[in-house]
Amino acid sequence: MSNTPYNSSVPSIASMTQSSVSRSPNMHTATTPGANTSSNSPPLHMSSDSSKIKRKRNRIPLSCTICRKRKVKCDKLRPHCQQCTKTGVAHLCHYMEQTWAEEAEKELLKDNELKKLRERVKSLEKTLSKVHSSPSSNSLKSYNTPESSNLFMGSDEHTTLVNANTGSASSASHMHQQQQQQQQQEQQQDFSRSANANANSSSLSISNKYDNDELDLTKDFDLLHIKSNGTIHLGATHWLSIMKGDPYLKLLWGHIFAMREKLNEWYYQKNSYSKLKSSKCPINHAQAPPSAAAAATRKCPVDHSAFSSGMVAPKEETPLPRKCPVDHTMFSSGMIPPREDTSSQKRCPVDHTMYSAGMMPPKDETPSPFSTKAMIDHNKHTMNPPQSKCPVDHRNYMKDYPSDMANSSSNPASRCPIDHSSMKNTAALPASTHNTIPHHQPQSGSHARSHPAQSRKHDSYMTESEVLATLCEMLPPKRVIALFIEKFFKHLYPAIPILDEQNFKNHVNQMLSLSSMNPTVNNFGMSMPSSSTLENQPITQINLPKLSDSCNLGILIIILRLTWLSIPSNSCEVDLGEESGSFLVPNESSNMSASALTSMAKEESLLLKHETPVEALELCQKYLIKFDELSSISNNNVNLTTVQFAIFYNFYMKSASNDLTTLTNTNNTGMANPGHDSESHQILLSNITQMAFSCGLHRDPDNFPQLNATIPATSQDVSNNGSKKANPSTNPTLNNNMSAATTNSSSRSGSADSRSGSNPVNKKENQVSIERFKHTWRKIWYYIVSMDVNQSLSLGSPRLLRNLRDFSDTKLPSASRIDYVRDIKELIIVKNFTLFFQIDLCIIAVLNHILNVSLARSVRKFELDSLINLLKNLTYGTENVNDVVSSLINKGLLPTSEGGSVDSNNDEIYGLPKLPDILNHGQHNQNLYADGRNTSSSDIDKKLDLPHESTTRALFFSKHMTIRMLLYLLNYILFTHYEPMGSEDPGTNILAKEYAQEALNFAMDGYRNCMIFFNNIRNTNSLFDYMNVILSYPCLDIGHRSLQFIVCLILRAKCGPLTGMRESSIITNGTSSGFNSSVEDEDVKVKQESSDELKKDDFMKDVNLDSGDSLAEILMSRMLLFQKLTKQLSKKYNYAIRMNKSTGFFVSLLDTPSKKSDSKSGGSSFMLGNWKHPKVSNMSGFLAGDKDQLQKCPVYQDALGFVSPTGANEGSAPMQGMSLQGSTARMGGTQLPPIRSYKPITYTSSNLRRMNETGEAEAKRRRFNDGYIDNNSNNDIPRGISPKPSNGLSSVQPLLSSFSMNQLNGGTIPTVPSLTNITSQMGALPSLDRITTNQINLPDPSRDEAFDNSIKQMTPMTSAFMNANTTIPSSTLNGNMNMNGAGTANTDTSANGSALSTLTSPQGSDLASNSATQYKPDLEDFLMQNSNFNGLMINPSSLVEVVGGYNDPNNLGRNDAVDFLPVDNVEIDGVGIKINYHLLTSIYVTSILSYTVLEDDANDEK
């Protein structure tokens, strides 16, 4: 049990024990080191012929555990002895509590509780008196400020935020005086702030004007992803939710989705109404040469009638006879004879009847081990209908199948030629396909045994004996198993400490007969295998005497697999070039001898050769444990071991992500294609929680006296150590978990004494077994609580175990009465459980205010500020975790029902170390918890080499990353709330700037920590030794979150103020879209200078928002380095592939294209008719999905809303002064709140230089295009005011909603709202759903004389709609348009008379009118003219990649269509990547860059 420092006024237990010691001198008799009990030496006057049995006193040692372990004298001081303090292990000084002291301890706890309540009442009274005495009405708003809210803290040592930030630790005697002084200062500050409310403030703590502002996080940061097969809710803490809070991103994505629909129409016209010269039959006939058998058949096996209407049927290249595309030579002679032997040829294994129905084999997107070559060219057709049956007739295929080929995985004849992996609702893959992941293959020299299960279908039934026989072949030899287990408990066990080490080893010994596995205990209490006794013999038999032993076997397999993956040699090699040295941390290899390093290298090389295949776990959980039934419909066999296996299984699914597909493809658990943030983990955790309730883990084991009587009875059953049947009278749960712990003691005692329980030694061992069982009970429960908190933080979902103390009274593991002298590492585990639970309470306080609807709907600013300050104190080490939790409770931020009352027994000295101390521990050779005093050389020699200390420090490192990620999230929420308010309330600019700087600092901190982790995972004996698999995804996820904010700032730095969707940018920080060569030359020069500075950039330093023009370049360098990192990690981790693709995509978007190179080809950066990108037409779209799927996307819903087609006179409701024609409500639409124009926090006074340059560039562009300059345009526009044109066609909506071909065929002409209404009140932006308005009222050319000139200034999309309003003659199928001087067009039509709408550029229209030449519309021209977003130039080729390509309408609405933005689906083809949920978030969060707003001419009219 952890000890609490006792007050001097209260008699301590130490003084009570010392008095008892003085009365009992015999208690100081020397005892055997490491023994749990000590015996009294008999008096000298006693007769030596005494026949009495020596009895050992049941005495608890008085010395601390560390001194007893070191065998030094302990002064028994509380809470920490002098010996532990000198040697730097005061945080581990632990005393076993006396049984008679329990009552005294309870009294002390009551006194401490009453003391805290009195102090809290006093703080509340002072707060109320302050409120009533305040003269102004603003006092009701100011008493909840971060300064005044600290009055709720009561007697907390750090009662003020000033003391917390400075890190001062004052004594209790000075605390009262400091509190009074602070109250006086706060009163003076309140009066001064009320008198100067409008004065500018440079600190958040000074201004209390906005402290009571309410934030509604339920609307701004909440997502609902609607899939075709389910719905997923994502809360504010999910990494995807950042897109909903940023106005820049909302506008960006609204434009992206509208542009996507336009390009889909362009592709549809191009592909549907032009000759498909490149179309070929999907069957590659070159690979199917003619044969005599197929000479009579002239018909292609492809059903050409199934092609979409309007598409030209594939033309047969030659009249050669057709042949089945299957290479029959690959089959055995028993199935299909060679081609020459046609007389006895049997039936082809391909079921050709499926082809006649239009069924085609699925697209082979990923290489399959079954396919020998690409026999079918699936890229030449667009059909992909749902397929529920394999085209191969397996009845004929499996007939006369050679039995000797069943075990040959290398023979291609033993596999079906069809790749079943991409077929929906088909049988599971054979086991051999699951072991083809190249990321975890062993190094050279590793064994490559072929297992029977790899050639057996797992959907077939297997008996238990067959499964055990297969597992015997899959498991490594006995010696290797023992080494793996020791490695796990030495390096990985602190990450999932829910096992009893000795108990688990005994069970493994029983199952696998590892009689030589008895460990040799070293000086540090760590069990090390003896290589001399272990034999390198394989596993020949697996004994499962009890049902629960199957779960132990499953845990063993997970340990073997996870430890093998975590070997440092298996980690991914990361080389970041010159920047690698910045992220290296010192390791401790220099402290190890050469022999120790050599021995470690030999062990690792031996372990690398023996990989446990993932199929072993699949067989165990499916056929032995039957986990699907246990976790869904039955709880008859649920016990503690079952819960332990479920926890290990969930832990393995999150850590070894590359094995997820393998584990779930053959399991009918509803967890298809699970991901790190998918719903599968939620369902599994809910099952684990319910099983824990079923076992009673939520109640403390001390509440059940029958445990004391049941557990000792199991010693008989285990003492026989070979019994196959358990005692039916004993509890199977207790029998499984605690029986093995008493094996040795029971075997030493006589059988009669063991049965009667009269042997004192046996009785003592039984008591120890009971305590260890209760200890495991408590560890499992609190680990489940921690899993619940982590899942809620990751997914943004509500916690399952809310208000823990309302239904659970389970004590912390520190309450277990266990002597840790033989197992010091278990003492560290116990300390960590207490510390981590306290950190979880801090996280719970944040989650309650963000995720709980009742609080998140009206959370106040000062509450978030208080959370930020307390988390800062925790991560910076200025305040102890006990004080932070107490402050949260006293301020009302954390209810006591969450478990805060358990903290009264915790050691104050065992807290979270500072992050620099964790990283620099190896360099300074100091303990993490050094008290600051100089230690002598003798003390250093005596200091313990603590077990798995590096793993514990790695866990501390991950806790720091989690806390700082929360700080980043809280600051980002406040930043996005106050930034748009700057145009209306200038006082919020300072708040937004400070929150943005804090968010950037913590984002860069997470970015650096991510780089530090991956740069040190392969170092020998480093901080992250054996933690490469467990911490890889959390670290990469935090780095990815930081990258999202980087992109947000890059967009602000390059685009300047957000002026609206139909307005020109007031000013820009980056390169403008003009033609001023001097401005361009200066930009190039500045860019070169900034690039030279970036070479000297220190990635370990924070980035300042006031960096000016170099801010975007500095942040871009971070993105490039992260892209380089993820590219190297993609070789090992699948989730790194997604992040690398998205990061690389946005890097290309952020890369500003060179105007000089563009202008050379056509003389204009907007007229590049000859420019062609080599892969534009072949890029697969990120936004590839049909309209129904698109509307389910949470990004689409947030940006556009659910909008249905409306009438011609309908419009949006008036929003913020915008007067629009039409009704105030839209049928079937969702009105979203508008986004106001505002300046970003990156806007500085140095941007004024760009104003005149932008105006000159715009004037030159107008002179180039139109031949005149509007001299009346006012370029000197005040900041924060949008330019308001006079009249005429000054600005049109850049993105008009899509129109279907049916509308054109029906004669409905899209129109645009009245221009006078559009251009009025330009200070406020329209609502987002106006982007998809389908009715656009264009001015009539016959009534407006300025129409001919205005049409030239319209966007290409508007021109497309204008061209649709002309006479369309019927001619050819090429879709070309002939422009005339009047602005009308003659457009070709298809054979059926459908009207065509082409995308014509305004420059093309102008050229056609002057030269009377035919202009062919070009997609690249369209893209180049619409690649400017608020001054940010976007790479047009990347734009195509964002918006996507043509979607075949025949594939729209299919039931098996891939969900748009699937959360758990990742598919990569040869060219691009299909968007997944993770990728699109990066595209949303970072795709700011892909926002392609069409070019606006705001002041171009008269």
Swiss-Prot record:
Keyword set, alphabetical order: Activator, Coiled coil, DNA-binding, Heme, Iron, Metal-binding, Nucleus, Repeat, Transcription, Transcription regulation, Zinc
Q: Where is the composition biased (Polar residues)?
A: 1-50, 143-152, 160-176, 432-447, 706-734, 1388-1411
Q: Where is the composition biased (Low complexity)?
A: 130-142, 177-208, 735-759
The entry's Zn(2+) 1-binding residues are C64, C67, C74, C81
Principal location listed in the UniProt entry: nucleus
Residues that coordinate or bind Zn(2+) 2: C64, C81, C84, C93
Under the heading InterPro entries, the entry gives:
bZIP_sf, Fungal_TF_Env_Response, Transcription_factor_dom_fun, Zn2-C6_fun-type_DNA-bd_sf, Zn2Cys6_DnaBD
Source organism superkingdom: Eukaryota
Coiled-coil stretches: 105-134
GO BP? cellular response to hypoxia; DNA-templated transcription; establishment of protein localization to chromatin; negative regulation of DNA-templated transcription; negative regulation of transcription by RNA polymerase II; positive regulation of transcription by RNA polymerase II; regulation of cellular respiration; regulation of transcription by RNA polymerase II
Which GO cellular component does the record give, naming just one? transcription repressor complex
Can you list the disulfide-bonded cysteine pairs?
A: none
Write out the ranges of the annotated region (Disordered): 1-56, 126-208, 432-458, 706-767, 1384-1411
Spell out the residue ranges making up region: Heme-responsive: 244-444
| Any one Gene Ontology molecular-function term assigned to this protein's record | RNA polymerase II cis-regulatory region sequence-specific DNA binding
Q: State its location(s).
A: Nucleus
HRM repeat locations: 280-285, 299-304, 323-328, 347-352, 389-394, 415-420, 1192-1197
Tell me the DNA-binding residue spans: 64-93
- Biological role: Regulation of oxygen dependent gene expression. It modulates the expression of Iso-1 (CYP1) and Iso-2 (CYP3) cytochrome c. In response to heme, promotes transcription of genes encoding functions required for respiration, controlling oxidative damage and repression of anaerobic genes. Binds to the sequence 5'-CGGNNNTNNCGG-3'. Is non-functional in terms of iso-1 cytochrome c expression in strain S288c and its derivatives.
Its assembly, as annotated, is:
Binds DNA as a homodimer. Interacts with SRO9 and YDJ1. In the absence of heme, binds to at least four cellular proteins, including YDJ1 and SRO9, forming a high-molecular-weight complex (HMC) which results in repression of its activity and dictates its DNA-binding specificity.
Anything else known: Heme is an effector molecule for CYP1/HAP1. The HRM repeat region mediates heme induction by masking the DNA-binding domain in the absence of inducer.
- Write down what this protein is called: Heme-responsive zinc finger transcription factor HAP1
